[in-house]
């Protein structure tokens, strides 16, 4: 179960005045999934579904990371993005 702070950061990232880069969004997605679900157990998307494939690969790269560590890293990343895009 994720913390209240994690849930607040997940909302805050959607309210940034500037959209994060594609790489930042992939990292956010992967950390969010690892924190909320755990290791990726989904089937790898087909080669022609590039967007979902990139998301799947980003999440897959976190396999073995604890949900608690992923949550902490997600919160830290959101804080960095808030500082970067809100200034």
Swiss-Prot record:
KW Ribonucleoprotein (keyword) present: no
Every ACB domain range: 2-87
Organism per entry: Saccharomyces cerevisiae (strain ATCC 204508 / S288c)
Descriptive protein name: Acyl-CoA-binding protein
Transit peptide recorded as keyword: no
Molecular function terms from GO: long-chain fatty acyl-CoA binding
Residues annotated for an acyl-CoA binding in this entry: 29-33, 51, 55, 74
InterPro entries: Acyl-CoA-binding_prot_CS, Acyl-CoA-binding_protein, Acyl-CoA-binding_sf, FERM/acyl-CoA-bd_prot_sf
Name of the gene: ACB1
Keywords: Isopeptide bond, Lipid-binding, Transport, Ubl conjugation
């Amino acid at each position: 179960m994720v913390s209240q702070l994690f849930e607040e950061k997940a909302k805050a990232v959607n309210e940034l005045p500037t959209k994060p880069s594609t790489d930042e969004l992939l990292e956010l997605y992967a950390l969010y999934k690892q924190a909320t679900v755990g290791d990726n157990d989904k089937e790898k998307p087909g080669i022609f579904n590039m967007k979902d494939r990139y998301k799947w690969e980003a999440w897959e790269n976190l396999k073995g990371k604890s949900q608690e560590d992923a949550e902490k890293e997600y919160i830290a990343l959101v804080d960095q993005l808030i500082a970067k895009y809100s200034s």
